[in-house]
Design a protein with these regions (language model features):
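Catalytic-loop of the protein kinase fold
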Residues: 225-228, 232
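Short amphipathic alpha-helical interface segments
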Residues: 12-31, 35, 39-40
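Short alpha-helical segments that sit at the start of domains
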Residues: 1-17
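Single conserved hydrophobic/aromatic residue that forms the stacking wall/gate
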Residues: 380-389
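Conserved ATP-binding subdomain of kinase catalytic cores across diverse folds
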Residues: 80-193
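ATP-dependent phospho-/nucleotidyl transfer catalytic cores
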Residues: 8, 51, 77, 133, ...
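Short amphipathic alpha-helical interaction segments
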Residues: 42-54
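A short, conserved structural fragment
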Residues: 58-66
Length: 389
């Protein structure tokens, strides 16, 4: 499911009211009957059909027919619109740009504020192509026995936002959390490269980066946390620039904010703005551009950093984080360490005999419990061990 904010400005307040009613009805109904939608939205039953028909055409809701009664269910598209509208009303998001990342459990978009500041919107989409036994592998539901994919996506976003806030407050290298609504998470834009895209690094920086990543794993563990998915897909690498370089870059106008508005035109609607391609472009040209973007997409580009550059890591993706008190904490810690070691061995032909172990780190933690963060109260620790490999 790809976010398309084109029709957000065309949806009327009554249609959003109906969409919200379907969402509220979904808490207790897998299929929400029409009369319940009318009751929750406080609209006339005769007008509900027309409003639902419009939402149905935009694929924001889906009609479900069964033997007992007919009704509607909310789609991920409708859930996206509700979240985007809420962020827009809070002035957190003004325009939506291109998709800059896609994963098994989420989609990443670049967005902008009314002042032109770039931000990153992460939309959780559990159950799309991610592992289907996620209800057992991740502690999203707590004591609940069952839940919909949308509800778990919302729990994942809330959990990640809480982790990001605590980590950012304690000085960990993570993006700045900005806002969160439903299954979406808004954070600061970091001018950095995904570690998986970097193919060449100076030897001194390879050692420096390896040491920084191992130190970050240890620092998290000393704070009572284990990332659980510490690999090249969840790590960004940022170039360290001095003030003179930053001034020269800003003087040239090479800022992230220009990336969102570099192509296309800005369309203004009812409380929302979307960046689209120019109207003069034909459909054939658009298709050709899409094909070219697939080949030269930033997601597939290889980055080479030459001599003289200095780098530092930024950690992302936190829904799967667990406490060091988790029954599988030692296995998860060792897996994080081995992911880094394996990547550096394959990508940079670099291998070090120096790496942390869970037992050694926990021994130092027992001597000084004051380093553990308050974030532990946010964690749900499984009562019994689970196979999380």
């Amino acid at each position: 499911m790809k976010l398309d904010a084109t029709d957000v400005r065309y949806i009327t307040p009554d249609e959003f009211r109906v969409l919200t009613a379907v969402e509220m009805g979904s808490k207790n109904h897998e299929v929400v009957p029409t009369h319940l939608i009318a009751q929750i939205s406080s609209l006339r039953h005769t007008g509900i059909s027309k409003l639902l028909s419009g939402l149905l055409k935009r694929r924001l809701v889906a009609r479900v027919r069964n033997n007992v009664y007919d009704g509607f269910r909310l789609t991920y598209g409708g859930y996206d619109y509700l979240a985007v509208r809420a962020l827009s009303k809070r002035k957190s998001v003004y325009g939506i740009g291109n998709q800059i990342g896609i994963g098994k459990e989420s989609d990443i978009y670049i967005v902008s504020t009314e002042e032109g500041e770039c931000r990153v919107l992460k939309i959780h989409r559990l159950g799309r192509i991610s592992f289907r036994n996620i209800k057992e592998k991740r502690d999203y539901m707590g004591k609940r026995k069952s839940a919909s994919w949308m509800y778990m996506s919302r729990l994942a976003a809330e959990k990640e936002y809480a982790f990001m806030q605590i980590l950012h407050q304690h000085g960990f290298p993570v993006p700045t959390p900005v806002d969160q609504n439903r299954h979406t998470l808004l954070m600061s834009y970091e001018d950095a490269y995904p570690l998986r895209q970097i193919s060449v690094l100076p030897l001194d920086q390879i050692r420096r980066l390896y040491s920084a990543l191992m130190a970050l794993i240890v620092r998290l563990a000393r704070a009572g946390l284990i990332h659980g998915d510490f690999n090249e897909f969840n790590l960004l690498v940022r170039e360290i620039r001095n003030e003179e370089e930053d001034d020269s870059v800003s003087a040239e106008g090479d800022t992230p904010a220009t990336d969102v508005r570099s192509e296309g035109v800005v369309e203004h609607g009812k409380g929302f703005t979307r960046i689209v391609k120019a109207d003069s472009a034909s459909e054939e040209e658009s298709e050709e551009e899409d094909e070219e973007e697939d080949d030269t997409s930033p997601l597939n580009q290889v980055v080479e950093l030459g001599e003289g550059v200095q780098v530092e890591p930024i950690l992302i993706d936190f829904p799967q984080m667990v406490s060091t008190d988790h029954p599988n904490a030692d296995m998860l810690f060792d897996r994080d360490v081995n992911c880094v070691r394996r990547f550096f061995r394959k990508r940079f032909r670099f291998e070090s005999e120096e790496f942390p172990t869970f037992a050694e780190v926990m021994e130092t933690v027992r001597r000084d419990e004051s380093e553990r963060l308050d974030v532990l109260c946010l964690l749900y620790t499984s009562p019994s061990p689970r196979d999380l490999s």
